C-alpha cells in the first residue's frame, strides 16, 4: 500500500531534520517507496526512520543513513556507481535515480533475486544486480566514480579503493561488527586518498565469500 501524503511529509521532514538536505537526494527518496522493500510484519514501519530486518539475517538501513550516505557520495547524472551489499535493494533504487549506471552486488543469492524482481517491477533499467563477493568489487566494470558499501569493514577494502576513479568517492562504514563504527568518506586524489570521518553508525559486518544457497 502506498504511503499517505501525511506519511510522506513526515518522512521527508525526518530526513531533513537528520541532515539530509540535498534536493536531488530528497526527491529520489520521495519517489522510491520504501514500503516495496520491506516485507511481512515490518511493512507497516517502512516510513519510520529505523533499520528493519530482512531475509538472510540482514537489515534494510534506516532512511536517514541511506540519505546521508547518498548525499555524501555527491552522485552526478554521468556517474557509474558500485554498491556493495544489495540487501533489499532500497539503496540501489535510490542511486538509480541519480546516476547513469548502478552495479550492486551481494553474497546472498536470495537477496539479489528478490532485489532484481523489485527493480524490474519499478522499471529501473540502469541497475545491474550480481551475486558475488562484494569485498573484491567488480574489476571488469571498474573504475567507478562512486562506491557505497552498506556493511562494515575493519578498514576500507583495498580492492575497492583500487577500483575508485581519481576524483571518485567511496562511502564506507569502518570498525568492528560488535562495536560502534565510523562512517568514512574516502576521496581518491592524484597523490592518494583523503579520509573524512562523518558520524557513528552500526552496520552488519562485511563478510567475504558467497553465502550458501540455503542460508536463512
UniProtKB/Swiss-Prot annotation:
The lineage of its organism: Bacteria, Pseudomonadati, Pseudomonadota, Alphaproteobacteria, Rhodobacterales. Its EC number is 2.1.1.77. It catalyses: [protein]-L-isoaspartate + S-adenosyl-L-methionine = [protein]-L-isoaspartate alpha-methyl ester + S-adenosyl-L-homocysteine. This is Protein-L-isoaspartate O-methyltransferase. It is an enzyme of class 2 (transferase). The gene is pcm. Keywords: Cytoplasm, Methyltransferase, S-adenosyl-L-methionine, Transferase. Its main location: cytoplasm. Belongs to the methyltransferase superfamily. L-isoaspartyl/D-aspartyl protein methyltransferase family. The active site is at 61. It comes from the Bacteria.
Amino acid at each position: 500500500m502506498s504511503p499517505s501524503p501525511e506519511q510522506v511529509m513526515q518522512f521527508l521532514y525526518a530526513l531533513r531534520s537528520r541532515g539530509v538536505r540535498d534536493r536531488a537526494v530528497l526527491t529520489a527518496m520521495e519517489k522510491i517507496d520504501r514500503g516495496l522493500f520491506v516485507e511481512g510484519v515490518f511493512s507497516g514501519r517502512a516510513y519510520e526512520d529505523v533499520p528493519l530486518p530482512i531475509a538472510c539475517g540482514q537489515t534494510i538501513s534506516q532512511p536517514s543513513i541511506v540519505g546521508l550516505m547518498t548525499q555524501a557520495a555527491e552522485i552526478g547524472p554521468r556517474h557509474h556507481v558500485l554498491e556493495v551489499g544489495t540487501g533489499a535493494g532500497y539503496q540501489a533504487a535510490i542511486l538509480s535515480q541519480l546516476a547513469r549506471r548502478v552495479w550492486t552486488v551481494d553474497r546472498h543469492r536470495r537477496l539479489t533475486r528478490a532485489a532484481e524482481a523489485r527493480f524490474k517491477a519499478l522499471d529501473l533499467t540502469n541497475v545491474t544486480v550480481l551475486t558475488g563477493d562484494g569485498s573484491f568489487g567488480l574489476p571488469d566494470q571498474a573504475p567507478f566514480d562512486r562506491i557505497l558499501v552498506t556493511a562494515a569493514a575493519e578498514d576500507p577494502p583495498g580492492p575497492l579503493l583500487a577500483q575508485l576513479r581519481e576524483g571518485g568517492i567511496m562511502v564506507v562504514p569502518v570498525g568492528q561488527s560488535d562495536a560502534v563504527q565510523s562512517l568514512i568518506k574516502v576521496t581518491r586524489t592524484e597523490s592518494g586518498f583523503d579520509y573524512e570521518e562523518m558520524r557513528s553508525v552500526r552496520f552488519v559486518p562485511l563478510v567475504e565469500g558467497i553465502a550458501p544457497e540455503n542460508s536463512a
